[in-house]
Amino acid sequence: MNLTFDPYDLNEMRAYFRTWYEETGREDFRFMATAGKEGTPPAQRNYKYIPAGIYVMRTGWGPEDSYFHVHGIQLERGEVSSHSHNDTGHVEIHAKGEDILTDSGRYIYNSSCWKDWRHYFLSAKAHNTLYVDDHEMGTVPGVTRTRGVRTYLHAFEENEQYQLIDISHNGYDFMDDPMFHRRRVVRLPDDVYVIEDRVTGICREEHDIRLYYNFAFGHLDGENGKFDYTSQKGRRYTMTVQADKKLDFEILEGSEDPIGGWISYGYAWRKPIPQLIAKHSGKAPIHFITVLAPAGTRAEAAINGDAATVTLAGGKVLTLTENAVELR
């Protein structure tokens, strides 16, 4: 471990950019250090950091721009494994300058007597991704401090019609009945987001299969796969979740039994947030399609055989098959 006193505030990301700007003179670092008040924005909008497993696409660097982030790290052993949450496939959405789907944070460490809370914030439940049987992603039976998670990036592309991040991972491969997760996130014009999940495997046993969505501060209600969310700025969104098998739904907010619907911005600090859970009890395979769109925007999803479709205003249709994404 190296003891360092730079940057000036280890808990503030902008301090790192400030130090980098002072060392390099780069105006994009100055832009980040001053939250856009000085300097110039980065020339590039979309970034893929494959070793770190961070994939980000955005519309721009202004205060009313949007971005989405998909997480897909490579894990094996040591501190990278020990400090990583069960969040492969996690997606965050920031629309028009505010968080919509968010990360729940860390809350507390194992040295605390609140180990059930530590387990929750580490788990897939506290992230916007697939949960299976409360299995810790990548763990191998009988092997400690090793998590064999591998993520494959299928596509990271932008064209005139959409932005796409497409990954798959083996986080549930080491269960007795192995399962695999592929997730595609598509951003369409007008901040329409499509999240497609394909869960496959040997499919011999029944499982507790869930999708979790943790919303930023706001209000969430609804039922039967259609939900209304009002953001902190009072903007209204609609989320629909469906699958090719039966789903049950639950909304938690500040729940202590079961633990669910919490966010932590600092150590031992937590506040309630809305959390949506889509549940299926049974065997894989299962195919999910989730659509998040501003209220009143036409975005009608359906699953027909291998294909998932989303019909948009004007009659355009987004089609996702196993090997292709098309909008026409």
Predicted regions and their residues:
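Short, surface-exposed loop/helix-turn segments at secondary-structure junctions
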Residues: 71-75, 110-117
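Catalytic Cys-His active-site segments of thiol-dependent hydrolases/isopeptidases
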Residues: 101-106
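Short, surface-exposed beta-strand-loop junctions and turns on beta-sheet-rich folds
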Residues: 63, 76, 107-109, 173, ...
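Carbohydrate-active enzyme catalytic cores, enriched for enzymes
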Residues: 1-100, 158, 282, 287, ...
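CBM-like, beta-strand-rich accessory domains located in the C-terminal region of large
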Residues: 6-7, 14-17, 21-22, 112-114, ...
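Catalytic-core segments of enzymes that bind and process phosphorylated/nucleotide-bearing substrates
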Residues: 94-96, 107, 133
